[in-house]
Amino acid sequence: MVRYMVTSALPYANGPIHAGHLAGAYLPADIFVRYLRLKGEEVLFICGTDEHGTPITFRALKEGRSPREIVDEFHEHIKTTFERAKISFDFFGRTELPVHYRLSQEFFLKALENGHLVKKVTKQAYCEHDKMFLPDRYVIGTCPYCGAENQRGDQCEVCGHPLTPEILINPRCNICGNPITFKDSAHYYIRMQDFEERLKKWVESQEHWKPNVRNTVLGWINEGLEERAITRDLDWGIPVPLDDEDVKGKVLYVWFEAPIGYISITIEHLKREGKENEWKKFWLNLDGETKVIHFIGKDNIPFHAIFWPAFLMAYGKYRDEEVEAEWNLPYDIPANEYLNLEGKKFSTSRNWAIWVHEFLDVWPADYLRYYLTAIMPETRDSDFSFEDFKKKINEELVNNLGNFVHRAMTFVNRYFDGVVPERGELNDLDRQALEEIEKAFKETGELISNYRFKDALKRVMELAIFGNRYFDYQKPWKTAKENRERTATTVNVSLQIVKALGILLEPFLPDASEKIWHLLNLEEVKKWSFEELPAGHRVRKAFPMFRKVTDGEIIYFIVNYIGRGNPDSAKILLNKYYKQEDVVKVTLERFGEKRKDEALALLKSIYGDEFKGEKPEKAGKAEKKEKVKEGKKMEYVSFDEFAKLDLRVGKIIEVNDHPNADRLYVVKVDLGDEVRQLVAGLKKYYKPEELLGHYVVIIANLEPKKLRGVESQGMLLAADDGERVALLMPDKEVKLGARIR
């Protein structure tokens, strides 16, 4: 039986995780692993922080702290962020573990023993001002391949080509900014040319790889592989395990030892689980049944598809008292392209980024997972847009998925006391619905297996769309009056679709999946197969699964988070979407009176000289308040006139923005035997989530009228004192449609 060893690229422990990281290496892997678990496959999902190398020492130097303090802080921060984003690693380790030191030094010595390493004295970057050898990342200059400026000496962020300080144009120190020199220094190099032919044949045989990965790797190999240094002039890292004065005080290059972390972290995890030797079946080719799959971003393709396999080859066979075997080479490396932000590449140094931990302070993890999956850069770069984020969540997640689940759960509770009803005779649409469930499982599974996560999520959402159309076509609110059996069948089939969605969503939206499982009152373990909800099973009462993303939330996020890190970036984003007066108003409301000075200072830092300040109260507003206080002269109506009004109790089941008006909502109200669409001027006073699920009073026999192009089939009743608006709501639940007398 096939087993899976799944890894995500080890993040550097020198800073937080942004949405580009998540979309590239972590969310795709999590979707894949959750699917495998639902299928009952044997799978191990491993990751951990990369805690050596220049990114860590560079940050420590800038902040006047030790590298140990930096890695300890960010290991915990990154681990917590992944947990909040529902990334379900079996174990999240670190490369500061003793087992990693031991194994990395063992790999070095084995490669040396097998003749694949050579010691060379070469010119290394040196800063006369700081009196130190400079690691590649401490050197910046112009990329000789694409001409991009301010690129680090290890890899160009623009074209992705690996670099060395020697080939940079106009290289300078990234610490002090002065031009660098080059001094002699002894280092060990791996002879990559020893593996060129073997690597080429191996890559050519990987016909199941993504074309972008396979073509990139073959292009590299065809250019010819050269010796590359695997030791560095640093004092933080894994010491070179030799009694050699030439390399005394030097460490293993992080690009050599970091991927070994996949194995060392696996060993540590299984040792803690009391399965000390089980790591071998995942990493050694004992039976040909293990598939090692590395999820990475495209900048890591050469390191995982060329250098890492070469290190495994350089080690040779692993031998101990129990086994003798070759290492498992990667089975697949499904690298994603880049995620951009509003048309520009993510930049951590300029804070042009969506930091995951900050995003999750404002929105649920499922919102980020849904949007990143929907725009996942699987074969080409994609773009994170706040406007598109709002649109996709509100139209697809809330209006489609959430609406269907809520409708089905509401009807089973209203008409069948929360018990799944027996089905009657099936019509063609009923049968099609049940067939759609089976098709959704088959097709979604195939798409996930082929790393087409964007299409897989789309296929799941198509089932929710079908569910809504099925519900609309069957019209259970009408058949409930005349044909209970038909209504029972519609509700039963709808609940089967809801259960199917609860399983199908698990890889993508684990929290939504759990909410559906809770609504259906299920305790069974989810499996990637479908067993129908039995008639007679009791479910729970409906509640809204999602809330809409609002402009106020987006403004607050940009101001409070991006604005603090980089006011210029915040200004660009705010000016793209919003008027300054609206930004000021929302910010002051969100911060509140106690934090007003803080809010104004933040806005001033964002807008600079363009800041117009707090908008004064409109002239006449105070007069309006006074008029309300004075009140109008009472005018009487006859009882007969009042009796003409059909006032009824309803429940708000859906709230959408009006497509043509900024201050209006389009609200759907359930009256028991029908659902009415109303247009209401409540946007200034209520958020959508504050309206959903509430019982309200409407005028049901008001002549329908189009308001800004949308028909309103009644009117909500509310009190207005000139400053605040309050809906009229019954003080206890009554039957929907009950008349006000």
From Swiss-Prot:
Annotated Zn(2+) binding sites: C143, C146, C156, C159
Catalysed reaction equations from the record: tRNA(Met) + L-methionine + ATP = L-methionyl-tRNA(Met) + AMP + diphosphate
Domain named tRNA-binding: residues: 641-741
InterPro entries: aa-tRNA-synth_I_CS (IPR001412), Anticodon_Met (IPR041872), Met-tRNA-synth_bsu_C (IPR004495), Met-tRNA_ligase_1 (IPR023458), Met-tRNA_synth (IPR014758), Methionyl/Leucyl_tRNA_Synth (IPR015413), MetRS_core (IPR033911), MetRS_Zn (IPR029038)
Protein residues bound to ATP: T348
Gene3D superfamilies found in the cross-reference section: HUPs (3.40.50.620), Isoleucyl-tRNA Synthetase, Domain 1 (1.10.730.10), Methionyl-tRNA synthetase, Zn-domain (2.20.28.20), Nucleic acid-binding proteins (2.40.50.140)
UniProt short sequence motif 'HIGH' region, positions renumbered to this chain: 11-21
The record's free-text note on cofactor binding: Binds 1 zinc ion per subunit.
One Gene Ontology MF term: ATP binding
CDD domains noted in UniProt: Anticodon_Ia_Met, MetRS_core, tRNA_bind_EcMetRS_like
Top-tier EC class: ligase
Gene field: metG
GO biological process, one term: methionyl-tRNA aminoacylation
Motif 'KMSKS' region in this chain: 345-349
Presence of the UniProt keyword Kinase in the record: no
Cofactor(s) essential for the protein: Zn(2+)
Subunit structure: Homodimer.
EC number: 6.1.1.10
Entry protein name: Methionine--tRNA ligase
Annotated localization: Cytoplasm
Signal peptide feature range: none
